[in-house]
Amino acid sequence: TFASLERRRRTLPDVKLCISTNGLALPQAVDSLVELGVDHVTITLNAIDAHVSAQIYDWVYFDGQRLRGKEAAQALIDQQMEGLQKLIENGVLVKVNSVLIPGINDAHLPSVSEAIRSSGAFLHNIMPLIAKPEHGTFFGLNGQREPDQQELAHIRELCGSSMTQMSHCQQCRAD
């Protein structure tokens, strides 16, 4: 990633550099990203509570160890929030993507919106879970239903009271 960003910066100096990340290694990367001229980062952050996050992520590989359950979830959340804060302190625009997973993080997303607003993120993009079995994802293969349009609109409305929402995003696999 860093080599690609450096090449782009050298060959296309006027192009805005932005990246998207799950945030697990973000705090350690912020200084390099800022030095390379990255001025916009999107962090996928689906929960700020380890109990909720542990239902989304079975494990993370962090600091040379495979962590599981709430320990994994808390490590991911801590890294995401620390990275978000460091980016803001360095003048980088931060957008947060959250995937709406019915029955798992739907009631929790307003708390996510409040936390990221308090940390300085400028935009929250709540996207519907893509859980079609043919995509081969964990949730798709295990029968997790996707949110319907009414659920998505309702959560975006709830979260919109504390944080600017991005509502023009269409369902895709890009984020």
Language model regions located:
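Auxiliary Fe-S-binding modules of radical SAM enzymes
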Residues: 110-175
